[in-house]
Amino acid sequence: SPPLAFTFGLGGLVLFPMSVGASIVLLEQAAPPALLEAIPAYGVTTLITAPTSYRVMAETARKMHLSVAQGGTLRQCVSAGEVLPAATRALWKDATGIEIIDGIGATEMLHIFISHPDDDARPGATGKVVPGYRACVMDDAGRPLPPGVVGKLAVKGPTGCRYLEDARQAQYVKDGWNYTGDAYLIDADGYFHYQARTDDMIVSAGYNIGAPEVEEAL
């Protein structure tokens, strides 16, 4: 369902399917009801949409028996575009038996650079660095932070960009690192955990607290 103008849509609905000779189902109106109808109608095996859609579709999907294990065709479900709450991941898996594959990319990077296979999902984590890319969490001075400390996500890889005229983006690339504008922490096993946008952080008693963390607690 992502627009083709987004990196998520360009990769998920054009480049990746074409690279393996897969057929693509493009819907003019890709709202959750239309997505659910399209899966059995076209024998869809991989569903690509945002976390909000998975949450909205879960209860109806439970009755439709869409997954291969339930007698349907659906084998994989991919999510990006916004943070994937652990509750949404669990809700969809309970309804379909399928673990959502999460990931984060950026239009400037033209690729998802942190993700995980479906058998290596960790609730609350986006995943690990995709082969070919490097990622770390930096402090305000551009120094790598240790595991468990929230900082700015910085990425290097075979794709990237530079801004030429927009003064607001003059700090996007520093020392070859692309700063995505996301606040993350890395756990001891190398999994990246999204916290918030870097302009959406709450600082309390010297700690950086992500707004989504507060929302989940409430």
Language-model region placement:
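Conserved AMP-binding/adenylation subdomain of ANL enzymes
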Residues: 4-46, 60
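Conserved ATP/PPi-binding loop(s) of AMP-dependent carboxylate-activating enzymes
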Residues: 128-132, 143-175, 207-209
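Hydrophobic alpha-helical segments, especially N-terminal targeting/anchoring helices
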Residues: 138-139, 180, 186
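Active-site glycine-centered loops adjacent to acidic/histidine catalytic or metal-binding residues
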Residues: 81, 105, 127, 142, ...
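Alpha-helix capping/helix-boundary segments
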Residues: 31, 52-54, 84
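Gly/Ser/Thr-rich phosphate-binding loop
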Residues: 19-22, 41-49, 58-122, 134
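AMP-binding/adenylate-forming catalytic core of the ANL superfamily
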Residues: 47, 154-157, 162, 169, ...
